């Protein structure tokens, strides 16, 4: 499922940045539960939140939220 791929990429990039879910949530302006839900594939963020997450992690938004399979 696309949500799972997004969640896995977000978790990986957040971890590489040395950031906790709580810290990312604080910097983006959402709850830690929201970050947890995105990482667990329960939902996708709004466009505004997606852009803020990407900006906070210093990566292009499509690196996290590209829904197409990488090897397709």
Predicted segments — roles?
Residues 29-43:
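Recognition helix of helix-turn-helix/homeodomain-like DNA-binding domains
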Residues 8-27:
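Short basic helix-loop element that most often maps to the first helix and adjoining turn
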Residues 1-5, 69-72:
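A detector for short, charged/polar N-terminal pre-domain segments
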Residues 55, 65-72:
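Short, charged recognition helix plus adjacent turn
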Residues 23, 34, 63:
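Residues in the helix-turn-helix
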Residues 4, 15-16, 44:
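Short amphipathic helical patch at the helix-1/turn junction of helix-turn-helix
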Residues 48-63:
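DNA major-groove recognition helix of helix-turn-helix/homeodomain DNA-binding modules
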